[in-house]
Swiss-Prot record:
This is Succinyl-diaminopimelate desuccinylase. The lineage of its organism: Bacteria, Pseudomonadati, Pseudomonadota, Alphaproteobacteria, Rhodobacterales. It catalyses: N-succinyl-(2S,6S)-2,6-diaminopimelate + H2O = (2S,6S)-2,6-diaminopimelate + succinate. Keywords: Amino-acid biosynthesis, Cobalt, Diaminopimelate biosynthesis, Hydrolase, Lysine biosynthesis, Metal-binding, Zinc. Pfam families: M20_dimer, Peptidase_M20.
């Protein structure tokens, strides 16, 4: 009989793999060994030097439950600032210490342990379980989960539903399930005027004035009032610069960067179109030209409340005694890629210490998460 790994101990072992993006650090090798010993078919899916792991138990094409997570971590900073070395996986007084303890080697370990326990039971379940684990979530994200999903599609692999194991709970285990995320886009806006002497503004065209007018229009009123499942969209000016050290010179150019986190009342295209139209109107009046470039991290998405959401929420409620809030708050995650393939939710640990010096997680919380994942699998395939 295949032994079921202790998810807390597996978390500590994964932490000892120094997998700072883009280095794999041995974490995916360890995970493949653990899953392979339990009968999972494992494939390394590396693209452009980015390491990823696909693992499936059960027949291709069967009803399939998926899990998406990452083993890469952010840099630890100065190791001397840590109580215990950041890649020690130190275990003491019920805590596991190290970079990735919260985000999110613990989530990966919890699901791996839950899945191994589930698929090795007697009789074996009727269905398939997939783990799609990337080494590029904390970095650019272009060749991580995207590459896994492309690889799966090319080979006829699919997931019918998926959980992303990001730390979803703000303060207490079981208080929140992410059923969607806002979209995110960044716009670089450059205003081109005519340089001149500050004493003779009629001989110049001040790009700062035109740019400030555009920024005022964009920030003077909210983009919306929110929707049924989303808070109001937010637009933030994150950079304003003209690179001009002289107080008596009107600069030729001025630049701003804005970031928009938008709900399902908008698309990136509709927001981009609105901003360009406002810039064009100001340009026509001021004769200052605008050049705008747009980078879209992801569109907003929602997994509407229904059978899958109800199943996960019911298990969380039974295990924790809390009625989880169905939320779309926070930043982006790799769920923005998965949502194009199947319904996706995010549920994981409490995110108190993620990305901090002395990142750590209670060992019992990791074991509780594994129990929740195991019960979700059992309920899904019942």
């Amino acid at each position: 009989m295949t032994p079921i790994p202790d998810p807390a101990q597996l978390t500590a072992r994964l932490i000892r793999c120094a997998s700072v993006t883009p280095d794999e650090g041995g974490a995916l090798v360890l995970l493949a060994d653990v899953l392979g010993a339990a009968g999972f078919e494992c494939h390394r899916v590396d693209r452009e030097g980015v390491p990823n792991l696909f693992a499936r138990w059960g027949a291709q094409g069967a009803r399939t439950f998926g899990f998406n997570g990452h083993t890469d971590v952010v840099p630890p900073g100065d190791p001397a600032s840590w109580t215990h070395p950041p890649f020690s996986g130190h275990e003491a007084e019920g805590w596991i210490w190290g970079r990735g303890a919260t985000d999110m080697k613990s989530g990966v370990a919890a699901f791996a342990a839950a899945a191994i326990g589930f698929v090795t039971q007697t009789p074996p379940p009727d269905g398939a379980v997939i783990l799609a684990i990337t080494g590029d979530e904390e970095g650019p994200g272009k060749h991580g989960t995207r590459a896994l999903l492309d690889w799966m599609a090319a080979r006829g692999e699919r997931m019918d539903v998926c959980i992303v194991g990001e730390p979803s709970n703000p303060d207490r285990m079981g208080e929140m399930i992410k059923i969607g995320r806002r979209g995110s886009m960044t716009l670089q806006i450059e205003a081109h005027g005519i340089q001149g002497h500050a004493a003779y503004p009629h001989r110049a065209r001040n790009p700062i004035h035109a740019l400030l007018r555009l920024l005022h229009e964009l920030t003077d009123a909210p983009l919306d009032e929110g929707t049924e499942h989303f808070d109001p969209s937010g637009l933030q000016v994150t950079t304003v610069d003209c690179g001009n050290p002289a107080s008596n010179v009107i600069p030729e150019r001025a630049r701003a960067v804005i970031n928009i986190r938008f709900n399902d009342a908008h698309t990136a295209e509709s927001l981009d179109r609105m901003i360009r139209a406002r810039a064009a109107a100001i340009s026509a009046e001021t004769k200052v030209d605008f050049a705008i470039s747009t980078d879209v991290s992801g569109e907003s998405f929602l997994t509407a409340p229904g059978p899958f959401v109800d199943l996960v929420a019911g298990v969380v409620r039974e295990e924790t005694g809390l009625d989880p809030v169905l939320s779309t708050s926070g930043g982006t995650s790799d769920a923005r890629f998965v949502k194009d393939h199947c319904p996706v939710l995010e549920f994981g640990l409490v995110g108190h210490f993620m990305h901090q010096v002395d990142e750590r997680v209670p060992a019992d919380q990791v074991r509780q998460l594994a129990r929740i994942y195991r019960r979700i699998l059992e309920r899904y395939f019942a």
